[in-house]
Amino acid sequence: MVVIHGVSLTPRFTLPSRPLNTGFNAGNSTLSFFFKKHPLSRKIFAGKQSAEFDSSSQAISASEKVLVPDNLDDDPRGFSQIFDLESQTMEYTEAVRTEDQTMNVVKERGVKPRIVPPPGDGKKIYEIDPMLRTYNNHLDYRYGQYKRLREEIDKYEGGLEAFSRGYEKLGFSRSDAGITYREWAPGAKAASLIGDFNNWNSNADIMTRNEFGVWEIFLPNNTDGSPAIPHGSRVKIRMDTPSGIKDSIPAWIKFSVQAPGEIPFNGIYYDPPEEEKYVFKHPQPKRPKSLRIYEAHVGMSSTEPMVNTYANFRDDVLPRIKKLGYNAVQIMAIQEHSYYASFGYHVTNFFAPSSRCGTPEELKSLIDRAHELGLVVLMDIVHSHASKNTLDGLNMFDGTDAHYFHSGPRGYHWMWDSRLFNYGSWEVLRYLLSNARWWLEEYKFDGFRFDGVTSMMYTHHGLSVGFTGNYTEYFGLETDVDAVNYLMLVNDMIHGLYPEAITVGEDVSGMPTFCIPVQDGGVGFDYRLHMAIADKWIEMLKKRDEDWQMGDIIYTLTNRRWSEKCISYAESHDQALVGDKTIAFWLMDKDMYDFMAVDRPSTPLIDRGIALHKMIRLITMGLGGEGYLNFMGNEFGHPEWIDFPRGEQRLSDGSVIPGNNFSYDKCRRRFDLGDADYLRYRGLQEFDQAMQHLEENYGFMTSEHQFISRKDEADRVIVFERGDLVFVFNFHWTSSYFDYRIGCSKPGKYKIVLDSDDPLFGGFNRLDRKAEYFTYDGLYDERPCSFMVYAPCRTAVVYALANHD
């Protein structure tokens, strides 16, 4: 029992836990989902897990033991020898690499063995932020729980490195002798593996259960040496559960497909022959000093009303991203999700890439091409919740409500209509940690944007809560310590095993310690998404220009903790969804339909919209954080909104959400608009490209030098220094200022390096971009020097010393 602020707190974490089930039946016909050759990467190797039947066991033991086959030649399905996982001499008999073989591979590749460093004392957070000392009871308890977790993992699993390789033991694993399939389903009373390979006969391949609730079966090769389950064929696990007989997609399935005419997805046994495996050709880029992220959704990345493919995205969109000047691409909706309109956030199969866009090999090819272009690839990973589907997801997987998720109301997110993980479960930790590692290891993603972190960290999930920044909001009984511990574990695992990997957390609450290393007592993220900025811009755009407050803009953009790196954005995919508007649409509305052609007279609404669109994005990048994000298409002011194809939805309360007749018209990206030199979208795209290249050349987002010298509410002018640059924004709707004096820190000759009024960017060409600006000595706006400029209305101009390299 621990006391925090006078309230007793019983630790919620328990080592054992249980999963959940999904169910559906399949036909008896055999079917392969692969009709052509596909390139690929590497095999998945697995060690043996226990497999004795014990109907009384519902929990995972803290001292896990593993059963391995006695003699595969004599009795491939017999198990008799028991080895403790702590044993250093345990052998895997399924042609798994031995320790010597592994070390040989490590030596051949010149790779050092990867080890997650042990926890520190977690006390440095109090030096970084002295305000945290008031809450040391909570924070010390949190870190104590984390250290205990690490100790238990070291003791019973051989460390975090081994624990995060659950995909080598659970799910399907292939050896020279055959295929082993294991599934953790303690609620099931009986289980069998079914599929095309055995004509869906539930009596053909009955599984056995061990004392920890893990079901297992070994299928020896056919007499001709071929695997018992053909690559590309359908598979499921049939279980007798407390909820009845259920046919479920294996929880660790690596690929799943929805066949034409079928509603639920089918699990696919995915093990292509060597010649079809994609082999990565290009090294992963080093972590960029400043992140400029292009947020993208592969399915909706086509100009045509269709679901786009990994191959098309690789060939058509990646070069565009590179040309625009971004150095990272963040890909949404990678994990398989049966409901396309969920934008990828209702995940059903966590280890499977979305089959709508192609095969796993084609996704690997996409990532490899991005690396060739020097782009870092981040995955939008969803560990905050899961689809509540029982037919093709994790929900009710073994017939129980509390398998992978919390039982009862705590296990449901009423707003998202989804299930919530129990982060205090040992096997849930194994599942999610292994999932993160799988994407890094198998697909070579360079990091993650973790979705919905606020929902994870609080039992109220951030719903109907207005965070004010008061520290009592973060460190009390409404904080889910188990979830925070999981986030610490996954960040420690990622950064320990993949030092160049990047983690970004979507947190709207402003949780202190969020971006402090785990060793120092923090949660361990590299960046926090600065979500308040986008909300502020929408709030501003609903007001008249006369009501915009310069101080309000500056406060929102700079409201972040010292030493906490943030990703700023003016708008992301959230603002583009149906029911909302993009910034461009807020600004220009219906005029976008008729007045974006350069050969047609403009309107005041279009002129205002084009000017403010550029200014909003530049000041967001200039002041908002150490990284920047843009959702695809918004760089050129993509019109309208995103609306995924969907039918009418009837909710449980009887209400109806109208559909759009399954139209793809607003579920695509009209890149042709930004490329057309006869449309005004082109100028917005050119400006965004110039903005990215300016940051690349000057690196201002990661400079420690930032000074706001002018915040003039009467003139509507903001002047600030970031790095070696001086930014001047005139938000006034009519007033332009001649001989306007601005302060600067360094003397010398200045030049214009970016001008939003450039006609190339759809501006009015009111500035001489070849002019030189010489400084005067003497204090002005608290700066040692100053120079005189012309500041046209609704214009942003960036100045740099003329002798900058």
From Swiss-Prot:
Broad class of enzyme this protein falls into: transferase
Transit sequence range: 1-32
Annotated knockout phenotype: Modified starch composition. This phenotype is enhanced when associated with SBE2.1 and SBE3 disruptions.
UniProt subunit comment: Monomer.
Source species, domain of life: Eukaryota
Protein function: Catalyzes the formation of the alpha-1,6-glucosidic linkages in starch by scission of a 1,4-alpha-linked oligosaccharide from growing alpha-1,4-glucan chains and the subsequent attachment of the oligosaccharide to the alpha-1,6 position.
Induction of the gene: Induced by light when associated with glucose, fructose or sucrose treatment. Induction by glucose is mediated by the transcription factor ABI4.
Organism from which the protein derives: Arabidopsis thaliana (Mouse-ear cress)
Enzyme Commission code: 2.4.1.18
Expression by tissue: Expressed in seedlings, roots, stems, leaves, inflorescences, seeds and flowers.
Official protein name in the record: 1,4-alpha-glucan-branching enzyme 2-2, chloroplastic/amyloplastic
Keyword set, alphabetical order: Amyloplast, Chloroplast, Glycosyltransferase, Plastid, Transferase, Transit peptide
Catalyzed reactions per annotation: Transfers a segment of a (1->4)-alpha-D-glucan chain to a primary hydroxy group in a similar glucan chain
Pathway per the UniProt entry: Glycan biosynthesis; starch biosynthesis
Gene Ontology MF annotations: 1,4-alpha-glucan branching enzyme activity; cation binding; hydrolase activity, hydrolyzing O-glycosyl compounds
Active site: D451, E506
Subcellular location: Plastid, Chloroplast stroma; Plastid, Amyloplast
Similarity comment: Belongs to the glycosyl hydrolase 13 family. GlgB subfamily.
GO cellular component labels: amyloplast; chloroplast; chloroplast stroma
GO BP of this protein: amylopectin biosynthetic process; cellular response to fructose stimulus; cellular response to glucose stimulus; cellular response to light stimulus; cellular response to sucrose stimulus; glycogen biosynthetic process; starch biosynthetic process; starch metabolic process
